[in-house]
C-alpha cells in the first residue's frame, strides 16, 4: 500500500480533502510574502500572513505538499547532504493547517488516524513528545488516542532559555508561537539511537516524522505570552522520511525517487558502485536546482542565484569525481519529472528552460573546474597542518568561481578544515578595496531623513502651485536658500516625479515673482519629494508658495521609454520563456536600459522577434489604463510585480491591452501608439544569469535608424555598390581576403623552410649536442613556432633558441628535441632568457614561448644561453 512517494503524496492530500481541507498547490520556492526569507523552507510560509491575521482566505482548513529548499542562510543543510541519511537541499513537506478552526484534539486525531489507519503503521513503533507544561496535549494523547503514558515524552526548555525548546515553536522574537507535539517512528533495535530526551537521541533509531504546532500565544516584546483569540494549527511531515518507512528502508536515499535518480546518474556516467556518496549528492542537488530554475531563480553571484550556483557547482564537482567528462547534470531532468509525478507540473512547463540553464552553468564551471582543483590539490599536498588558509580558499573563489563550501567539501574528504574566518577577512578586504575605489565626492543629501509628506499630482498635471515645507543644504535643514545656493526644496504637493522603479526624477523649474530654482533632479526621501537644484534668481523661504513646472519634453520622452519597458518585459517572456524576470531598469529621456534574468546570450533572431513583437503592440495603439486596487486583486488579474519590491496593500496596476499588466507607480503615455518606434541598440551580459538590453524610442529611434542607414550607404559607397548589394559585395571581399591570407601563409611557410635550411647550418656543437641560438631580423612573431619546428626536424637532435626584438617588445621561443628533454627543459630555458629582458614565459619541455619589454637587452640575454646549457649538458 502506498509504496511510491507519488502515491503517498496523493493519499495524504486526499485524506485531508475528505476531512474538510482545501487542497492548496505548493507555492513557489521564492517566497512572495517574506523578504527576510531566502527560500520557502516550510509548509506554513505561504500562510504566514494568514497566521498573523493580515490576510484572509475563503477556507479555514488547508492541506499542501510544499516544495522546500534549505541551503544558505539560517537553514543550511548543504554541507551534510550526501553524507547523512536525511539531509537534503530539497524536500517536500506534507502539511495540514487550521486557521482558527480546529485545534489540538482534531489535529492530533487526524495525524494518528492517517498514520495508523490509512498507512497502517504499527502503533507499537510510534512514540510522541509534548511540551513539558502542555498537559492538554498529554491528556489527548493518553486518554483519547490511547498512547501509553511511557510513550509520551515531555520535553522542556532544552535550549538555554524560557520557551527555547524542541517542542515550542516561535515565528520570531515576537508574534504567534506555541507548543508542539512530535510523532517519532522506531526503526528498530538494530539501529543505534535512543528516544527523544535521552543522551542517545541524536542516533538514527527514533526518527521524527510529524510535527504538529499549536499556535495559541502571541509573544510580546517583553516576553509575555498573550493567548491568541483564534488558535491555529500548523503541521509538517517530510515526505521522504515517511516514504522510507513505507518502503521498508532506513535511509531517505533508498526510496524510489532517489534510487531512480541515482541509477540514472550511474548510467550516464558509467558508474557501477551505487553506494558512492557522490551519486547521492547529485541525486539530491538535481531536485533543488531544477525546481529553483523552474521558479525563476537563475545562477548568479548574489542572493538566491548564488546559492543555486553553489549547489550546481557542488553537483558538477561530484560528477567530476565520478568520472564525468562532459555536461551530464541537465540530463537528469526527464527522470526527475517522471519520478515526481503530479508534483512536477511546473517542471514540465519549463523543462527546456531548466535543462538549458543547468547545462550552460555546468559548461561554464567546467572550464575552470580542472584548473581550480589542480591548484587546490597542490595547496593541500603542501599543507603541513589540518587547516587550509583563508587566502587560498578566497583565491579559488575569486579566480575560479569555487564557492567556499565546495572547497570545504574537497577538504572534508581529506579530513582537512578551511579557515573560514580567514576567507571572510579576505572577502572583507576586497570589498573595502572596491568601496575605496568607488568613492567620490560625498553627496550629503543622499542620506537625508525628511519627516514630511508630499502629495504627488504629476499623473494628470505638469504644473501647479505648492507650499515650501522643507529646505536643505548639504544634508542640513535651513530656513532659506539664497541666489547661487545649491540645495533641496520640499513642497507639500508636486507634479515632479521622484526617481523610483527605474524611472529617473523629473527636471524643470520652481518659480515665483523674481525667483527661479532650476530643478536638476527629483528624489524620494521617505514620503517626501525633494527637488534638487540651484537658485538661479531671488531667494526661497520656508512657507513660501512656488509654481512647480515639469519640463514637458523631457517627461514625455521619459514616458515613452517607461511604457516600452512594460512591452519589452512581456515580449521577452513570450519569446524567451516565463523564467524571464526584471532585475533592474533605467528609464531616461534619451534611452532605456532593461536588465533581466536569462542564462545565455539572446540570439539575433530572438532579439528581432522581441523587437517586432514590441513594435506590433505599439502599432495596435493600446490604451494604457492605470487602476488602484487591492494587491490580492492585482495578483488574481495576473499583474507582474518587480522582484524584491515591497508593495502596500493598495497598488497601482498599469495595463496595455491584453499584452501587459504590471504593478507600477511610474508615469506613462496615453496609448502605445504614442511611442512611435522601438529599436534595440545593444544586448549583453552584465553578470552571470543577468542580461541587459539598451534601446531607444520615438524620435531617438528614428534618428538611430537614420544613422544606421547612413553607415550602410557609406559602406556601399566604399564597396562601389548600393545598399542592397552590401552584404554580397562584403562577402566576396572577405572570401578574396581569406584566399590572399592563405596564399600569404603558404609563402611564409616556404620562406620559413628556406630560412630554416640556412639557419640549421649555423648550429654549433656543445658537449655533442647541436645548439642554435639566433637573434632574427625581418621575421614576424607569428612565424616563430613553425620555424622552430622546422629547425628541430632539420637538426633531428638539438636545441633551438630564437628571439625577435621589436619596438619595446621581445618575442622568444625555445625548442628541445624529445630525446634531450630529460637534460634540458624548454620552459626553464626560455624563462631564463625572458627574465633578462623584463619578461616571463613557459611551456612544455619540448617547446616554450616568452615575451619581454626590454629589446635592447636581447642580444646579451641570448649570449647567456651557451654558458647556461654548458652546465646542464656537462
UniProtKB/Swiss-Prot annotation:
> Can the keyword Protein biosynthesis be found in this entry's annotation?
yes
A Pfam family matched by this chain, by name? tRNA-synt_2c
Task: Please give the InterPro entries that the UniProt record associates with this protein.
Answer: aa-tRNA-synth_II/BPL/LPL (IPR045864), Ala-tRNA-lgiase_IIc (IPR002318), Ala-tRNA-ligase_IIc_anticod-bd (IPR018162), Ala-tRNA-synth_IIc_core (IPR018165), Ala-tRNA-synth_IIc_N (IPR018164), Ala-tRNA_ligase (IPR050058), Ala_tRNA_ligase_euk/bac (IPR023033), DHHA1_dom (IPR003156)
- Catalytic activity of the protein: tRNA(Ala) + L-alanine + ATP = L-alanyl-tRNA(Ala) + AMP + diphosphate
Instruction: Please provide the record's keywords in A-Z order.
Output: Aminoacyl-tRNA synthetase, ATP-binding, Cytoplasm, Ligase, Metal-binding, Nucleotide-binding, Protein biosynthesis, RNA-binding, tRNA-binding, Zinc
For this protein, the record's SUPFAM superfamilies field holds:
Class II aaRS and biotin synthetases (SSF55681), Putative anticodon-binding domain of alanyl-tRNA synthetase (AlaRS) (SSF101353), ThrRS/AlaRS common domain (SSF55186), Translation proteins (SSF50447)
List GO molecular-function terms, semicolon-separated: alanine-tRNA ligase activity; aminoacyl-tRNA deacylase activity; ATP binding; tRNA binding; zinc ion binding
UniProt EC number = 6.1.1.7
Primary location: cytoplasm
Identify the GO cellular component terms for this protein. cytosol
Q: Which GO terms describe its biological process?
A: alanyl-tRNA aminoacylation; negative regulation of DNA-templated transcription
- Report the transmembrane regions from the record: none
Q: Which domain of life is it from?
A: Bacteria
Entry cofactor note text?
Binds 1 zinc ion per subunit.
Q: Domain comment, in the record's words?
A: Consists of three domains; the N-terminal catalytic domain, the editing domain and the C-terminal C-Ala domain. The editing domain removes incorrectly charged amino acids, while the C-Ala domain, along with tRNA(Ala), serves as a bridge to cooperatively bring together the editing and aminoacylation centers thus stimulating deacylation of misacylated tRNAs.
PANTHER family for this protein: ALANINE--TRNA LIGASE, CYTOPLASMIC, ALANYL-TRNA SYNTHETASE
What does it do? Catalyzes the attachment of alanine to tRNA(Ala) in a two-step reaction: alanine is first activated by ATP to form Ala-AMP and then transferred to the acceptor end of tRNA(Ala). Also edits incorrectly charged Ser-tRNA(Ala) and Gly-tRNA(Ala) via its editing domain.
**Family label:** Belongs to the class-II aminoacyl-tRNA synthetase family.
Q: Which NCBIfam families match?
A: alaS
What protein am I looking at? Alanine--tRNA ligase
Amino acid at each position: 500500500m502506498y509504496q511510491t512517494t507519488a502515491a503517498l503524496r496523493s493519499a495524504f492530500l486526499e485524506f485531508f480533502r475528505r476531512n474538510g481541507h482545501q487542497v492548496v498547490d505548493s507555492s513557489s520556492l521564492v517566497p512572495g510574502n517574506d523578504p527576510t526569507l531566502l527560500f520557502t523552507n516550510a509548509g506554513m510560509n505561504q500562510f504566514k500572513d494568514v497566521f498573523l491575521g493580515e490576510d484572509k482566505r475563503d477556507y479555514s482548513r488547508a492541506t499542501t505538499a510544499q516544495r522546500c529548499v534549505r541551503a544558505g542562510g539560517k537553514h543550511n543543510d548543504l554541507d551534510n547532504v550526501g553524507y547523512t541519511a536525511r539531509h537534503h537541499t530539497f524536500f517536500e513537506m506534507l502539511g495540514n493547517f487550521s486557521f482558527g478552526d480546529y485545534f489540538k484534539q482534531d489535529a492530533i486525531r487526524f495525524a494518528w488516524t492517517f498514520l495508523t489507519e490509512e498507512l497502517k503503521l504499527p502503533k507499537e513503533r510510534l512514540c510522541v513528545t509534548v511540551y513539558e507544561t502542555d498537559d492538554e496535549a498529554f491528556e489527548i494523547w493518553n486518554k483519547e488516542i490511547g498512547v501509553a503514558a511511557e510513550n509520551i515524552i515531555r520535553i522542556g526548555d532544552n535550549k538555554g532559555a524560557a520557551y527555547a525548546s524542541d517542542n515550542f515553536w516561535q515565528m520570531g522574537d515576537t508574534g504567534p508561537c506555541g507548543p508542539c507535539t512530535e510523532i517519532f517512528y522506531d526503526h528498530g533495535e538494530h539501529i543505534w539511537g535512543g528516544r527523544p530526551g535521552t543522551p542517545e537521541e541524536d542516533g538514527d533509531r527514533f526518527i521524527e516524522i510529524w510535527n504538529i504546532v499549536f499556535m495559541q500565544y502571541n509573544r510580546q516584546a517583553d516576553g509575555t505570552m498573550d493567548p491568541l483569540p483564534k488558535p491555529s494549527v500548523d503541521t509538517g511531515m517530510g515526505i521522504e522520511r515517511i516514504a522510507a518507512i513505507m518502503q521498508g528502508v532506513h535511509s531517505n536515499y533508498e526510496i524510489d525517487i532517489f534510487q531512480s535518480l541515482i541509477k540514472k546518474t550511474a548510467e550516464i556516467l558509467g558508474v557501477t558502485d551505487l553506494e558512492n556518496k557522490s551519486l547521492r549528492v547529485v541525486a539530491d542537488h538535481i531536485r533543488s536546482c531544477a525546481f529553483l530554475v523552474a521558479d525563476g531563480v537563475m545562477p548568479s553571484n548574489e542572493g538566491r542565484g548564488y546559492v543555486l550556483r553553489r549547489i550546481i557547482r557542488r553537483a558538477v564537482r561530484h560528477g567530476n569525481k565520478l568520472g564525468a567528462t562532459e555536461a551530464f547534470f541537465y540530463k537528469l531532468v526527464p527522470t526527475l519529472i517522471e519520478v515526481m509525478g503530479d508534483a512536477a507540473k511546473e517542471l514540465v512547463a519549463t523543462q527546456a528552460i531548466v535543462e538549458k540553464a543547468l547545462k550552460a552553468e555546468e559548461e561554464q564551471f567546467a572550464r575552470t573546474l580542472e584548473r581550480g582543483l589542480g591548484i587546490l590539490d597542490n595547496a593541500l599536498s603542501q599543507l603541513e597542518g589540518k587547516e587550509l588558509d583563508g587566502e587560498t580558499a578566497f583565491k579559488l573563489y575569486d579566480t575560479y568561481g569555487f564557492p567556499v563550501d565546495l572547497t570545504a567539501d574537497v577538504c572534508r574528504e581529506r579530513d582537512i578544515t578551511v579557515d573560514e574566518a580567514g576567507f571572510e577577512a579576505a572577502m572583507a578586504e576586497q570589498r573595502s578595496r572596491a568601496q575605496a575605489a568607488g568613492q567620490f565626492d560625498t553627496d550629503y543629501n543622499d542620506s537625508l531623513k525628511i519627516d514630511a509628506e508630499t502629495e504627488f499630482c504629476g499623473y494628470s498635471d505638469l504644473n501647479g502651485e505648492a507650499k515650501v515645507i522643507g529646505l536643505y543644504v548639504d544634508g542640513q535643514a535651513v530656513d532659506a536658500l539664497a541666489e547661487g545656493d545649491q540645495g533641496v526644496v520640499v513642497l507639500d504637493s508636486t507634479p515632479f516625479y521622484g526617481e523610483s522603479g527605474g524611472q529617473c526624477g523629473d527636471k524643470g523649474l520652481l518659480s515665483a515673482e523674481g525667483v527661479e530654482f532650476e530643478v536638476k533632479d527629483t528624489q524620494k526621501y521617505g514620503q517626501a519629494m525633494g527637488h534638487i537644484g540651484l537658485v538661479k534668481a531671488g531667494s526661497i523661504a520656508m512657507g513660501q508658495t512656488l509654481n512647480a513646472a515639469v519640463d514637458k519634453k523631457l517627461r514625455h520622452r521619459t514616458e515613452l521609454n517607461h511604457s516600452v519597458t512594460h512591452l519589452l518585459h512581456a515580449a521577452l517572456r513570450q519569446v524567451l520563456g516565463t523564467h524571464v524576470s526584471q532585475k533592474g531598469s533605467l528609464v531616461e529621456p534619451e534611452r532605456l536600459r532593461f536588465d533581466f534574468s536569462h542564462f545565455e546570450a539572446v540570439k539575433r533572431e530572438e532579439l528581432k522577434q522581441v523587437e517586432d513583437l514590441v513594435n506590433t503592440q505599439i502599432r495596435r495603439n493600446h490604451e494604457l489604463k492605470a487602476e488602484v486596487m487591492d494587491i490580492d486583486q492585482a495578483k488574481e488579474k495576473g499583474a507582474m510585480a518587480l522582484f524584491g519590491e515591497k508593495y502596500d496593500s493598495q497598488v497601482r496596476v498599469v495595463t496595455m491591452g491584453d499584452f501587459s499588466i504590471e504593478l507600477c507607480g511610474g508615469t506613462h503615455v496615453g496609448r502605445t501608439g504614442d511611442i512611435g518606434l522601438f529599436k534595440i541598440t545593444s544586448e549583453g551580459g552584465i553578470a552571470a544569469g543577468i542580461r541587459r538590453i539598451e534601446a531607444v524610442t520615438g524620435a531617438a529611434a528614428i534618428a538611430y535608424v537614420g544613422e544606421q542607414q547612413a553607415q550602410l550607404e557609406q559602406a556601399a559607397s566604399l564597396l562601389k555598390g548600393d545598399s542592397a548589394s552590401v552584404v554580397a559585395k562584403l562577402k566576396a571581399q572577405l572570401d578574396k581576403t581569406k584566399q590572399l591570407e592563405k596564399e600569404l601563409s603558404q609563402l611564409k611557410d616556404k620562406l620559413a623552410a628556406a630560412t630554416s635550411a640556412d639557419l640549421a647550418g649555423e648550429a654549433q656543437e656543445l658537449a655533442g649536442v647541436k645548439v642554435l641560438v639566433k637573434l632574427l631580423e625581418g621575421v614576424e612573431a607569428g612565424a616563430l613556432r613553425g620555424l622552430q619546428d622546422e629547425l628541430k626536424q632539420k637538426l633531428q637532435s638539438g636545441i633551438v633558441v630564437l628571439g625577435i626584438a621589436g619596438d619595446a617588445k621581445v618575442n622568444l621561443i625555445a625548442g628541445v628535441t624529445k630525446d634531450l628533454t630529460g637534460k634540458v627543459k624548454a620552459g626553464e630555458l626560455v624563462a631564463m632568457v625572458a627574465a633578462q629582458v623584463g619578461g616571463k614565459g613557459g611551456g612544455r619541455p619540448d617547446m616554450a614561448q616568452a615575451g619581454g619589454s626590454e629589446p635592447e637587452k636581447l642580444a646579451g640575454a641570448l649570449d647567456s644561453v651557451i654558458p647556461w646549457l654548458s652546465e646542464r649538458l656537462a
